[in-house]
């Protein structure tokens, strides 16, 4: 009997991510529902409000991560759910994401979410990320007070350079490169004054 996994490591990792996120979303959602019920029974307090906000944020981030890091196929995800995932992930943070929400195939949504994560990595002081998805292309435009492009992850993403020293905080670069390659696509990066663009074109 062979010990070789039936799936390649990245495909296996996406299944693990999907499973973990799926199994955590329900109990965290139940915590949020319980807090909402509790708030209706007792006087409002900052502590309860903070707990409820934290539960909502955790649930939204899990939904975002399930799309970004999970398994993907031709399943179509509705615009409302995708918009909630994006807004929940970055609500009240240093990154503002603008996107005219539309339904997307899960594999397209995964590419888009990973592109947003890559853009976030290049905006250490925060900024605005504008996303457009149309005509077989995903275009991301970002601007902020400061941009920073670490050579390792960006060279891997755009030129396919080896990136053996990848950390957990940079794994989205590896995944975006790999998932784009599955579509025979290569992300392109262009820099301008105060901002930059990441583009994936040729989606079928």
Segments from the language model and where they lie:
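Glycine-rich/acidic phosphate-handling loop/turn and adjacent ATP-lid/helix
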Residues: 136-173, 201
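Conserved ATP-binding N-box helix of the HATPase_c
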Residues: 14-43, 107-133, 172-179
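Conserved beta-strand core positions
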Residues: 95, 127-129, 138
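Conserved DHp (HisKA) dimerization/phosphotransfer helix of two-component histidine kinases, i.e.
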Residues: 45-96
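Glycine-rich ATP-binding loops of the HATPase_c
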Residues: 184-191
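Polar low-complexity intrinsically disordered regions
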Residues: 183, 201-202
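Conserved short strand/loop->alpha-helix "switch" segment adjacent to the catalytic nucleotide/phosphoryl-transfer site
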Residues: 5-15, 46, 93-118, 124, ...
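Glycine-rich nucleotide-binding loop
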Residues: 192-199
